[in-house]
Amino acid sequence: YSQPDIEWNKRPEIDRWILSLLNSLIKDVDNYLDNYEPTRAGRAISDFVNDHLSNWYVRLNRKRFWQGGLTDDKLSAYQTLYTCLETVAKLMAPIAPFYADQLFCDLIAATGRENVYSVHLSNFPVCHEEQIDKNLEERMQMAQTISSMVLALRRKVNIKVRQPLHVLMVPVLDEHQKESIEAVKSLILSEVNVKDMKFVDNTAGILVKRIKPDFKKLGPRYGKIMKALAAAIQQMSQE
């Protein structure tokens, strides 16, 4: 890690996305720990690493990591991943002190980025608000959700991902949602191996809508009439 950092605004969108999530995570974990909620802090870190960093960012950027030569694109990918790992080590230090210290020391031994010999002697991460892009986070979350649903449908009907499909029909609620999905369209199509995507405004005849009462929320408020209310809800038409 001897090269200068690639400027944040010059990094690819997917790098800026994971850095946005990372800074949101710093903010959340700092708040949880200040309020003596280590369990919520630990879960937030776990969700970030498993759902976003490992299952999405690293997997989608394998070609960038493996490409020959040290281009700015490859350097940006490695620097972004390193920043995430080092920051996660610092965030988890109060919760998992030994593993966090091992991860931090392994990273520092390879790069010499810090002059301390333990994660517990380093400063706690600081959130960079200017790097948080909620619109970008929302778009990527839609890409993850849609991709997950399509892959689940493939498994349900036993159609393997390696078999390309012609078109993916996506119902949208409004123009904002349509624009958000359009921005990550190519990513979704690549992830689920579909050639094209069409947006559906009127889902009549295509989707079967079902409504199910949330007993946990409705029960305390409508306990005495909950049974009748549930029956009325389930009898609602698709319109």
Task: Give the ranges of each region predicted by the language model.
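Feature 926 captures the class I aminoacyl-tRNA synthetase adenylation module centered on the KMSKS loop
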Residues: 1-239
